[in-house]
């Protein structure tokens, strides 16, 4: 499939969640035509919303979604990618490209489909970006990095969206996605903890936002090791001990784990601080 050379390009979306709808909407904004949306059912709210946004028809069966489409986006939960894609085999056009959007799963999830239809291309495309809604996602996609796997057409598709594609080995996808989860989901959970601890101290959580933004900017400018500041980086065990004493047991446990990561990042050889951080939770 020649993604950038076709004047009439049609796509279908299977799995109208936030990521799938965002990617499909971005392509429609770039001249693609959406011809079909398949979800849990044609009447499901997510299916209706995606179809209305994309100007596409709602199909009852996944098996019918590929008809007339140059590109099929599979954005279902990971556990059903293989079977969902395989169901497309009877309707796919010769030369069509089928991509899934999973971060953790390799292109191999589409092997069953490719075995049945060797005349179509299959690949994986995972934008390394948080896409909480199509409206927000459309603003965030351009310039974001994107993990791709498959034929050159997958990379061309990513570039057409303004993404910055990179390739990773199939065996490294789970590790890659774990890194993305730590950087996004776990960071959000950590910031939620920081907000809760600040609130307990009578500090408005929004007061932390300039510090959070500055920390991310410092990592961008300097790298993690040089951006690290604070008591662990200074070897200030007395302050760390006061922090641990002030925190509830669950918060202290998280603090110890992350402080050990900070100590390793700092490169400090500080047995006393290590012993403090390895101590029993209160």
Predicted feature descriptions by range:
Residues 21, 25-29, 52, 86-90, ...:
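Short, well-ordered alpha-helices that flank and scaffold nucleotide-derived cofactor binding pockets
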Residues 11-13, 74, 148:
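Hydrophobic Val/Ile/Leu positions in short beta-strands of Rossmann-like dinucleotide-binding domains
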Residues 42-48, 106-109, 153-154:
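Short, charged/polar "capping" segments at the starts of alpha-helices
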Residues 6, 49-53, 113-121, 134-221:
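Internal alpha-helical scaffold of NAD(P)-dependent oxidoreductase catalytic cores
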Residues 217-275, 280-282:
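Interdomain hinge/lid region at the active-site interface
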Residues 53-137:
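Rossmann-like NAD(P)(H) cofactor-binding subdomain of soluble oxidoreductases
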Residues 35-39, 98-100, 145-149, 262:
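Short, hydrophobic beta-strand segments that form beta-sheet elements in well-ordered domains
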Residues 1-61:
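NAD(P)+-binding Rossmann beta1-loop-alpha1 motif at the extreme N-terminus of oxidoreductases
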């Amino acid at each position: 499939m020649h993604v950038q050379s076709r004047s009439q390009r049609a796509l279908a979306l299977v799995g109208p969640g936030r990521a799938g709808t965002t990617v499909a909407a971005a392509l429609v904004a770039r001249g693609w035509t959406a011809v079909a949306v398949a979800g849990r059912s044609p009447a499901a709210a997510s299916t209706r919303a995606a179809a209305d946004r994309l100007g596409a028809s709602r199909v009852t069966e996944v098996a019918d979604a590929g008809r007339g489409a140059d590109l099929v986006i599979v954005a279902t939960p990971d556990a059903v990618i293989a079977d969902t894609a395989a169901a497309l085999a009877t309707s796919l056009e010769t030369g069509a490209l089928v991509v899934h959007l999973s971060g953790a799963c390799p292109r191999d999830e589409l092997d069953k489909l490719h075995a049945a239809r060797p005349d179509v291309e299959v690949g994986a495309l995972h934008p390394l970006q948080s896409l909480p809604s199509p409206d927000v996602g459309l603003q965030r996609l351009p310039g974001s990095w994107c993990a791709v796997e498959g034929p050159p057409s997958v990379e061309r598709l990513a570039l057409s969206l303004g993404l910055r594609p990179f390739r990773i080995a199939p065996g490294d996808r789970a590790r890659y996605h774990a890194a993305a989860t730590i950087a996004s989901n776990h960071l959000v959970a950590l910031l939620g903890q920081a907000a809760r601890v600040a609130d307990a101290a009578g500090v408005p959580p929004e007061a932390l936002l300039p510090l959070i933004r500055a920390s991310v900017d410092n990592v961008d400018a300097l790298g993690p090791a040089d951006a690290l500041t604070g008591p662990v980086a200074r070897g200030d065990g007395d302050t760390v001990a006061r922090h641990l004493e002030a925190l509830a047991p669950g918060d202290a446990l998280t603090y110890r784990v992350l402080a050990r990561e900070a100590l390793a990042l700092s490169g400090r050889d500080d047995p006393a601080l290590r012993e403090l951080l390895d101590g029993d939770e209160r």
